[in-house]
Amino acid sequence: FIVRPDSVHLLRDNTISLKDVFAGAEWFPTATPAPQFGFLPLITGTLWVSLFAILIALPFGLAVAVYMSEVADHKIRNLMKPVIELLSGIPSVVYGFFGLIVIVPLLQRVFDLPVGESGLAGSIVLAIMALPTIITVTEDAMRNCPRAMREASLALGASQWQTIYKVVIPYSISGITSGVVLGIGRAVGETMAVLMVTGNAAVIPHSILEPLRTIPATIAAELGEAPAGGAHYEALFLLGVVLFFISLLINFTVEAVSSGKRK
């Protein structure tokens, strides 16, 4: 996006303003005679799916990492570790099929929805995809906590769970942050799985239970059909730049929160 100037050509066109692009509520690039290039529905969908995915994945990932590092015996840990690492290598389209067959019908029944494809379905699928990364990195960070620190805490009368909460987790916060950032990176940039389960409706969602569309899904679905050099093509390149800055913003936010906890 930096090497190619396509991402900025759209804004140089006098017929399309910065406000129309970033505050526009309609994405209809093939409309005639006036195509609509509003990014707001796509930005909103990306943020909703990504943030809900992390809210789902983080507590589960941290709980499993704590269990593997501090509670599980050697045999169980050796059984769980390769299984979790194997999950991280499964193609995203397989997760998408799983979401389409299992999660989408389940949400449709539980919430009595007209269609099960929704932002929540995408968030759950992305959370499942991010879990192996979060668990693996967090568990490795916790196991690096010095044994002497654990023994000193227990010698002072702290229980095992107090030691985990007051000693192990604070010591491992940098590793936990790395796992979360890597998980967020996969969630924000994921394409195929989200494309299959979110409904792909380019409208601003009023609920996480409504269909929506994310930026990566839009780029993947439309780039092949957009005429090279046209306004639609340039808008998709600009969407890629926006996605890059959204990823940076979320990562900086996570890093700032974890830095505050370290202090």
Where are these regions (language model features)?
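Generic hydrophobic transmembrane alpha-helix motif, especially the helices
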Residues: 85-123, 127
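Residue-level signal for discrete positions within transmembrane alpha-helices
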Residues: 42, 46, 82-85, 89, ...
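Interhelical loop and adjacent transmembrane-helix boundary motif
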Residues: 109, 194-244
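Cytoplasmic-entry segments and transmembrane alpha-helices of multi-pass inner-membrane transporters
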Residues: 60-99, 137
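Transmembrane alpha-helices
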Residues: 137-138, 154, 160-198
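Hydrophobic positions within alpha-helical transmembrane segments of bacterial inner-membrane proteins
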Residues: 46, 50, 54-62, 66, ...
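C-terminal transmembrane helix and the adjacent membrane-cytosol boundary/short C-terminal tail
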Residues: 139, 143, 147, 154, ...
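Periplasmic/extracellular loop-to-transmembrane helix junction in inner-membrane transport proteins
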Residues: 2-53, 73-74, 221-233
